[in-house]
Every structure is written in structure tokens, then in C-alpha cells.
């Protein structure tokens, strides 16, 4: 059970254990889904249509993009920006899950609402994600820059990237795309947590008793379903965020096709609609859905697994 559980036999994890479980969950998930993230970002930043019929398009499908990136940049390209991405995932996972557990407990103790309700999980999940985003957003900008650059590289190391970006674009560069990120992350994370809880209830109702023994599989499947639902409903805002994060980085994007500049969130949405059509809002959706299913599934699976491990350790220690 993710979130505060008022039942007497609920998990009794400490806040430190919750943070560790969230961190490890982020670390494991990031290592597994990094290739999908790189492909998704390349698709999102390509202004040309993702179609073979457009001769100027560099990428037009998941398999074609995978082969081309592999041929041009080698297998390590699928883990470009992996160091800042891991820092991002570890920090984000810790803050998000710790905040969510604390917020749901606060709601249960300080209001008439049940901490396990859909609406409570939606609001608490969204707020927890916003707190985590504010904490790690500078690292997210670095990760996007590393994943977006082709060859020759603009940034060689993390330290080089931080220094170059600070000198050429100022300190505000590390919070580029923050507004659309917060706007997108609240409903996305809120739907992740609330849909995960709802799908678990549905799973328990629909699956016979003998099929409920494997709780890990249940967590993985429900997490994957929650990831697909939440990503589909909030995807355009994620695309705007990525486009805005590479503002000022246009020289490194020239090798991938057209280059555009955006004045802000609304201007970005307007230009995408005018020049790429409504389907432009969903560029990169297919790898994103695959990534969302895997990442959200593994995120909840890993978090629940390590929380259960800590719970068993605590119970054993208390019985001595």
C-alpha cells in the first residue's frame, strides 16, 4: 500500500526507510528505461514530422531511431546524460515518496478525509511531485541537454556543462521550463498515484483469490497501467517542457533538423499547433508510453518491494 495506511497491521516504515526505498526505486527504474528516454527526447525535439514521407526528418520511428543512434553515436548514446539522470532519479524518488507518505498521513490525522481515497492520492501525489521537481529541476535541465546533444559534443562532462551554461546563459538557465514542468507534473503524478491505488483495488476485485498471491506482479501491472493512463492524458505539457528546456541550445540542435525559438509556454504551444498540427503535441508518444509503462511499473514495484523488506526487518527487530 503506497501512502499512509491507518490499519493497525499497516507498514511501520520510518521516514528514513521511506526515503531510501524511494531513492533505490528511482535508481533501478532509471537504469532500465534510459534508452527509451533518449529516443523520446530526440522525437520531442524534432520539428519535422515523424514520418518516412518527410525527407528532412532525421527520425521517423522507434526502431529506425534506435538503429541510427546506434550507428552514429554507439551504444553509450542510449545512456547519454545518465549520471545527471541518476542524480535526478535518486533525489526525486526520495523527496516524492517521502512527501507523499507525509502528506497522506497529514490528511488522515488533520481532516475528515480517508487517506486512501482517489482524490486524496491525486492531490497528495501532485503536491509531492511538485516538491520533488523544485528540488531536482536543475539536474533535469542538465539531463535534457546531455540527451539532446549529438556529435560533436557541446558538453564533455557534468562540470563542463554547469560552467558553460552558467557563463553563457546565466543562473536562470537551470530553471528553464519550470512552469510547464510544474503544470504538467501535478496532474501526471497525481494520476499516477491515484490510478495506481484504484487499479490495485480493481485488481483485487477482478482477480480470484488464488491469483492474488503474487503481490509483486500485481504492483508491477497496476503501476504500468497507471503510467500509461497518466502519460497519455498529460503528454503535450511534457513536450512543451522539453522544447523550452533546450532554448539557447539551438546551435547543438542544428544537426537534427529545423531550429525554432519560443518566448514561453503559450508561444511554444501556438507554434507547434501552427507548424506541426495537432499531432505535433504527441510527437514521441509511442516511446513515451512504453517508457511510462516500464518506469511507473518498476517505480511502484521497487518502492513497495523495499518498503516491505524494511517492514519485515522492523517487525523482526521488534520481536526480539
From Swiss-Prot:
User: What biological-process terms (Gene Ontology) are attached?
Assistant: deoxynucleotide transport; thiamine diphosphate biosynthetic process; thiamine pyrophosphate transmembrane transport; thiamine-containing compound metabolic process
Q: Which domain of life is it from?
A: Eukaryota
The outcome of changing residue 37 to A is:
Decreases thiamine pyrophosphate transmembrane transporter activity
Which residues carry the post-translational modification Phosphoserine, per the record?
Answer: 51
Report the InterPro entries cross-referenced here: Mit_carrier, Mitochondrial_sb/sol_carrier, Mt_carrier_dom_sf
Please give the chief subcellular localization of this protein. mitochondrion
> Membrane-spanning residues where?
19-39, 87-107, 122-142, 173-193, 220-240, 293-313
Outcome, altering residue 137 to A? Decreases thiamine pyrophosphate transmembrane transporter activity. Does not affect protein expression
Would I find Endoplasmic reticulum among this entry's keywords? no
Outcome following mutation: residue 177 to A: In MCPHA; diminishes thiamine pyrophosphate transmembrane transporter activity by 70%
For this record, the Gene Ontology CC terms, alphabetical, are: mitochondrial inner membrane; mitochondrion; nucleus
Q: What is the effect of changing residue 192 to H?
A: In THMD4; reduced protein expression
Q: Reaction catalysed?
A: thiamine phosphate(out) + thiamine diphosphate(in) = thiamine phosphate(in) + thiamine diphosphate(out)
In the record for this protein, the Solcar repeats are positioned at 13-106, 116-202, 214-309
Keyword terms, alphabetized: Antiport, Disease variant, Membrane, Mitochondrion, Neuropathy, Phosphoprotein, Repeat, Transmembrane, Transmembrane helix, Transport
Clinical condition linked: Microcephaly, Amish type: A disorder characterized by severe congenital microcephaly and severe 2-ketoglutaric aciduria leading to death within the first year. Thiamine metabolism dysfunction syndrome 4, bilateral striatal degeneration and progressive polyneuropathy type: A disease characterized by recurrent episodes of flaccid paralysis and encephalopathy associated with bilateral striatal necrosis and chronic progressive polyneuropathy.
- What is the annotated role of this protein in its UniProt record? Mitochondrial transporter mediating uptake of thiamine diphosphate into mitochondria. It is not clear if the antiporter activity is affected by the membrane potential or by the proton electrochemical gradient.
What family, per the record?
Belongs to the mitochondrial carrier (TC 2.A.29) family.
What name does UniProt use for this protein? Mitochondrial thiamine pyrophosphate carrier
Q: Which organism is it from?
A: Homo sapiens
